[in-house]
Amino acid sequence: MKFFLILGFCLLPLIAQGKVFQRCELAAAMKKHGLSNYRGYSLGHWVCAAKYESNFNTAAINRNRDGSSDYGILQINSRWWCNDGRTSGAKNLCKISCSALLSSDITASVNCAKRVVSDKNGMNAWVAWRNHCKGRDVSQWIRGCRV
């Protein structure tokens, strides 16, 4: 029994960690989940946002000065979009646990991102997108990808 307990603790980091996508792999996954031209934003915009938000890492978590945190490949914020159980006054507009956004399966992140971008601010909700992708040629982010 002790052996299995130790084995479980050793394997937990492997099970719990997310995934770091390759650029074209992420582009294909995002396209499969319907982000290509979603709300008028090309696939290049989504891949660019993911690069600068999380470096394509689904397990990324970053704390903000206001006490909220950003989660997952698109760094979805706990103040507005998900519930992390510790952000006071959180709205949880995606009606999802923030931990669900850390999965190697990006379905939850994409579904919540669709909700975020449907808001009046669109992709302006993502600071990294505003700073690195908005108004720029983002075709480089899908160049050479079979999407």
UniProtKB/Swiss-Prot annotation:
Ranges for domain C-type lysozyme come to 19-147
Q: What does this protein do?
A: Lysozymes have primarily a bacteriolytic function; those in tissues and body fluids are associated with the monocyte-macrophage system and enhance the activity of immunoagents. Has bacteriolytic activity against M.luteus.
Q: Where is the signal peptide?
A: 1-18
Q: Which SUPFAM superfamilies match?
A: Lysozyme-like (SSF53955)
Listed InterPro entries: Glyco_hydro_22 (IPR001916), Glyco_hydro_22_CS (IPR019799), Glyco_hydro_22_lys (IPR000974), Lysozyme-like_dom_sf (IPR023346)
Alphabetically sorted, this entry's keywords are: Antimicrobial, Bacteriolytic enzyme, Disulfide bond, Glycosidase, Hydrolase, Secreted, Signal
Q: What is the tissue localization of expression for this protein?
A: Expressed in liver and ovary. Not expressed in bone marrow, lung, spleen, intestine or oviduct.
> By what name is this protein known?
Lysozyme C
Cysteine-cysteine disulfides: 24-145, 48-133, 82-98, 94-112
Q: Which organism is it from?
A: Dromaius novaehollandiae (Emu)
MF terms per GO, please?
lysozyme activity
Write down the chemical reaction(s) this protein catalyses: Hydrolysis of (1->4)-beta-linkages between N-acetylmuramic acid and N-acetyl-D-glucosamine residues in a peptidoglycan and between N-acetyl-D-glucosamine residues in chitodextrins
Q: What else is known?
A: Lysozyme C is capable of both hydrolysis and transglycosylation; it also shows a slight esterase activity. It acts rapidly on both peptide-substituted and unsubstituted peptidoglycan, and slowly on chitin oligosaccharides.
This protein's GO cellular component annotations are: extracellular region
Compartments in which it is found? Secreted
Record's subunit section: Monomer.
Q: Per its UniProt record, what Pfam families does this chain match?
A: Lys (PF00062)
Q: Where is the active site?
A: 53, 70
Which Enzyme Commission number(s) are listed? 3.2.1.17
| EC supergroup of this enzyme | hydrolase
